[in-house]
């Protein structure tokens, strides 16, 4: 698990991001495809499309919003999220999205939060996100693979 201070920092963090889930989610996917261009092939709706085409898609905004809301759910329930995380692992395995994508996406989330929050994204929040991601979220999802 993570400490009470880390949980609080994470909840403060996601509270800011969750005020604009669609905008932040879209930014997250754009950043993900900028940092990992090959990952777009894992998304049937965007496979073979340019980043500009993806940016113009309503689907990126809608799916991005769902992802941010789900991430908020994980974070707000971080110390009791094992069931949610396991089911998300199983769901993503069923879509042929391996756990390695989740193991390697933290730099994307970190960069997106920094971009979206600016100076409000503190070192404590960054450290808490890393601790939660590597110590709770990825292991929880692995249980579903």
From Swiss-Prot:
Which UniProt keywords are present, listed alphabetically?
Answer: Heme, Iron, Metal-binding, Muscle protein, Oxygen transport, Transport
- GO MF entries: heme binding; metal ion binding; oxygen binding; oxygen carrier activity
The record's section on InterPro entries has:
Globin, Globin-like_sf, Globin/Proto, Mb-like_M
Cited Gene3D superfamilies: Globins (1.10.490.10)
Q: Which residues bind heme b?
A: 63, 92
Please list the residue ranges annotated as the Globin domain: 1-145
**Coiled-coil segments:** none
Question: What is the annotated quaternary arrangement, including any partners?
Answer: Monomer.
Its family? Answer: Belongs to the globin family.
Q: What is this protein called?
A: Globin-1
Organism (species) = Liolophura japonica (Chiton)
Q: What is the lineage of its organism?
A: Eukaryota, Metazoa, Spiralia, Lophotrochozoa, Mollusca
């Amino acid at each position: 698990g993570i400490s009470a201070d880390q949980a609080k920092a994470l909840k403060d963090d996601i509270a800011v991001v969750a005020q604009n889930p669609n905008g932040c989610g879209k930014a997250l996917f754009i950043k993900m495809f900028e940092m990992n261009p090959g990952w777009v092939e894992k998304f049937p709706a965007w496979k073979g499309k340019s980043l500009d085409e993806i940016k113009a898609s309503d689907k990126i905004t809608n799916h991005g919003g769902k992802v941010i809301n789900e991430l908020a759910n994980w974070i707000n329930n971080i110390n009791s999220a094992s069931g949610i995380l396991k089911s998300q692992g199983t769901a993503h395995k069923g879509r042929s999205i391996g756990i390695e994508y989740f193991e390697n996406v933290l730099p994307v989330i970190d960069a997106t939060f920094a971009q979206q929050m600016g100076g409000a994204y503190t070192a404590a929040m960054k450290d808490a996100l890393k601790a939660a991601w590597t110590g709770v979220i990825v292991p929880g999802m692995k249980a579903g693979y």
